[in-house]
Amino acid sequence: MTNRDRIGLTWISFFSYALTGAVVIVTGMVLENIAAYFQLPVAQMSNTFTFLNAGILLAVFLNAWLMEIVPLKRQLIFGFVLMVLAVLGLMNSHSLSVFSLCMFVLGVVSGITMSIGTFLITHLYEGRQRGSRLLFTDSFFSMAGTLFPIIAAAILARSLPWYWVYACIGVIYVAIFILALCFEFPQLGKKAVQGQPVAKEKWGLGVALLAVAALCYILGQLGFIGWVPQYATKNMGMDITEAGSVVGYFWTAYMIGMWAFSAILRFFDPQRIVTALALASTLLMYWFINTTDASMLKWIIMGLGFFSSAIYTTIITLGSLQTKVSSPKLVNFILTCGTIGTMLTFVVTGPIVDKAGFHAALATTNSLYAVVFLMCLLLGFVSKHKQHGHMDPH
């Protein structure tokens, strides 16, 4: 593989995370407008976004095998066609069934691109460099989280239809599509060059702990961010623009944190640092949902964004380091568990909001962060990442 191809594929990975971040994160911003569009209660409307999350889950789960059957370039081209059809469906239909189908298709497209993006980084880079590259790649998720709530707020504040937010997100896939046509992808499966057969390795208890941590982290994070706009407006008296800014502060700090930790992780044991970050994030989220001073929210959420930024990517990195040879199926398994957390976001938090309000939903997400801390702490006793020599300097 040429260096030109490596750089091009790395940029596809960056944009794949930006796409998924944009699709998932804008939900909290457009939810109320979509509910009004379909004349449904917000809590009921939130359930339809389960189709989005189910699409992501299905695509990530199946792509562990499909990557070896269907060439990566062909998958991305097919994804572009699906993206165009989904956005056109959102713009031209008033049917809730069509909306749900389009959300599912958007989820499938996001899941395909994110799993390909993650695989490319774990395939192209090794050891400590893999961890820092994954972190930088994941920072594009938070860049989208910074940019698209601002775009969504601007669109909604001007009384433009909510579906223009998704049209803007589609521009990211245009970039992925163009890059996919310009660069060569690694060949997998039967077409790949056969080297020496590698003995199958047992994944071990560490992978199970990381899988639970990934699920609880994503469920906690997206449940938190998904309801923060409503919590800020209904409980703390902010307007929609201020609420969008609070979400933007989180993702801006998240992005900065990723850049910082992509350098820091080179010098520290990833298991220890992820445990410390999970503890700090749990405490900061507790402070956020219990403060009565609205002016403090932006400062607390910036701290939360910064310290939680490296958790999920470090979980994936630690998972890939549990075996001597990086396994796409292992990485996709942890991604799938994280995606299950995405799918459960509104399934779990929607009924809590309906019965007990926004504060109770945020308290639930806080308890999920506490579980992440516990899993990372227990991982210290069983992790194999040091045994395989992955932590040697490169």
Swiss-Prot record:
Q: Name one GO molecular function term.
A: transmembrane transporter activity
Q: Name its cellular compartments.
A: Cell inner membrane
- Quote any Pfam family the record assigns: MFS_1
**The keyword Transport is annotated on this UniProt entry:** no
Q: Which parts pass through the membrane?
A: 11-31, 51-71, 76-96, 101-121, 135-155, 163-183, 205-225, 245-265, 273-293, 299-319, 333-353, 362-382
Q: Which PROSITE patterns match?
A: MFS
Q: Which UniProt keywords apply?
A: Cell inner membrane, Cell membrane, Membrane, Transmembrane, Transmembrane helix
Q: How does it sit in the membrane?
A: Multi-pass membrane protein
InterPro entries associated with the record: MFS (IPR011701), MFS_dom (IPR020846), MFS_trans_sf (IPR036259), MFS_TsgA (IPR023528), MFS_TsgA-like (IPR050375)
The yes or no answer to whether the keyword Membrane is present is yes
Provide GO CC annotations from the record: plasma membrane
The similarity annotation says: Belongs to the major facilitator superfamily. TsgA family.
Q: What is this protein called?
A: Protein TsgA homolog
Source taxonomy lineage? Bacteria, Pseudomonadati, Pseudomonadota, Gammaproteobacteria, Enterobacterales
